[in-house]
């Protein structure tokens, strides 16, 4: 499965970007997780509505999920041969109406800067990959 994180606005080249790159590299080293590609991009010109794609919007009012919920989602999507999982992180003002039809999830009740939300999401995807491959990183 290919996982993409689409972000509105600039992608800064600071410490947050370095951390994201570390987690991306670690995730891709765990081939048995089923995650074949993980990348961060600027917002696409159009949203992907393919039936082989799952789109999730990060929203403070979205469904609160935990790590094991995300693991279950990735496992189910892999089992159902879904090719792409897209996460969308918007601007502080929120999203346009183009994203209304997508499921909304939240990283928690706290508010994070968007650059830090990217890091947290990359770490959680890596954590999911370690759980799926029985790697000792995750301690439950």
Where are these regions (language model features)?
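Short, Lys/Arg-enriched, disordered terminal segments
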Residues: 1-5, 82, 139-140
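Short hydrophobic segments within beta-strands
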Residues: 6-8, 58, 88
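Conserved strand-to-helix beginnings and helix N-cap segments that scaffold or border functional pockets
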Residues: 16-21, 67-71, 118
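Structured adenosyl-cofactor binding patch, chiefly the S-adenosyl-L-methionine
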Residues: 97-139
């Amino acid at each position: 499965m290919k996982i993409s994180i689409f972000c509105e606005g600039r992608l800064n080249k600071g410490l947050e970007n370095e951390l994201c790159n570390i987690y991306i590299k670690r995730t891709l080293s765990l081939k048995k997780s089923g995650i074949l590609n993980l990348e961060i991009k600027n917002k696409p010109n159009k949203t992907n509505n393919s039936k082989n794609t799952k789109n999730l919007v990060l929203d403070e009012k979205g469904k609160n999920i935990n790590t094991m919920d995300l693991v279950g989602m990735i496992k189910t999507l892999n089992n159902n041969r879904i090719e792409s999982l897209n996460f969308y992180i918007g601007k502080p003002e929120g999203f346009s109406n183009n994203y209304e039809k997508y499921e909304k999830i939240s990283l928690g009740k706290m508010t994070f800067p968007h650059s830090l939300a990217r890091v947290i999401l990359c770490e959680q995807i890596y954590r999911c990959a370690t759980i799926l491959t029985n790697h000792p990183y995750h301690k439950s």
